[in-house]
């Protein structure tokens, strides 16, 4: 579309005088990122991609760069910058978000245990709604700050497990405990996915719900973090039985009493 490639026979050749590699952002495939600017000097100290900006450089966020702490004074996604100043606030910030998922197209499905597993295209909606200020020594929550950030929608690929009502009834959980159990299983499954798919846990995300309208049942969704999909969730679908069995075994065999980083605690959860 920009006449940067020319076909000769069965090959494509770069036609511009600058190097092709200079047009590729190693930090993000999502286009122009957000520059992080020191307000005292005007110097760009770093950058984040747009997909992560609402969570990392929202107003009031503590941004860590090369061991230094910076407080975000202003975040302007239209101008693609965040203004920061250096500080030692004594706390770190944890973004809080609200997420929903809608199944657009189920492409494959098969039985998996008492329920079934499927994969296909989903629409994700996410909004950062606030953040916690947590003590940098004890991790205790100081307070919660509300934010009014824009809602973002992304269409990508996902794999989802549907747990039938009979299994839910046998557990005899109330809605709160059922939601917590599904959420914990989602975290564990995401943490174990790199065993079955060439990804990092930061390359994927998840949503779990007691009742997803599209399935009519308790559903755990693991999705690619890239718009359009990256093949990670689909690779998980191919190994769903092994993946789900490993998830259950990790939950059953972990020696902790109330959840730990080895099982249900996720470093990236903001729900």
For each of these PLM feature ranges, what is it?
Residues 17-254:
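Extended Lys/Arg-rich polyanion-binding regions
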Residues 254, 259-263:
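Short cysteine clusters
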Residues 185, 263-265:
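Generic hydrophobic alpha-helical membrane-span motif
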Residues 265-271:
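Iron-sulfur (Fe-S) cluster-binding segments and ferredoxin-like electron-carrier domains
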Residues 1-11:
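A short, conserved structural fragment
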């Amino acid at each position: 579309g920009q006449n940067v490639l020319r076909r000769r026979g069965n090959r494509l050749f770069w036609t511009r005088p600058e190097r092709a590699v200079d047009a590729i952002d190693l930090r993000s495939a999502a286009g122009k990122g957000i520059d992080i600017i020191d307000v005292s000097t005007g110097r760009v100290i770093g950058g984040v991609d747009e997909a992560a900006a609402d969570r990392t450089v929202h107003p009031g966020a503590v941004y860590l760069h090369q061991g230094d702490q910076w407080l975000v004074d202003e975040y302007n996604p239209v101008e693609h910058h965040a203004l920061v100043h250096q500080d030692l606030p004594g706390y770190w910030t944890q973004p809080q978000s609200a997420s929903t998922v809608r199944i657009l197209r189920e492409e494959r499905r098969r039985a998996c245990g008492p329920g079934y597993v499927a994969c296909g295209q989903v629409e994700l909606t996410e909004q950062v709604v606030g953040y916690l200020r947590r003590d940098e020594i004890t991790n205790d929550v100081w307070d919660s700050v509300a934010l009014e950030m824009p809602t973002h929608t992304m269409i990508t690929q996902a794999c989802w497990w549907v747990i039938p009502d009979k299994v839910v009834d046998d557990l005899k959980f109330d809605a709160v405990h059922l939601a917590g159990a599904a959420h914990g299983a989602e975290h564990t499954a995401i943490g174990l996915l790199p065993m079955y798919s060439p990804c990092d846990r930061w390359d994927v995300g998840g949503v779990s719900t007691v009742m997803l309208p599209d399935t009519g049942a308790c559903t755990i969704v693991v999705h690619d973090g890239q718009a359009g999909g990256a093949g990670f969730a689909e690779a998980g679908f191919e190994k769903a039985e092994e993946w789900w069995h490993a998830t259950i075994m990790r939950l059953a065999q972990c020696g902790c009493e109330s959840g730990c980083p080895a099982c249900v605690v996720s470093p990236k959860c903001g729900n």
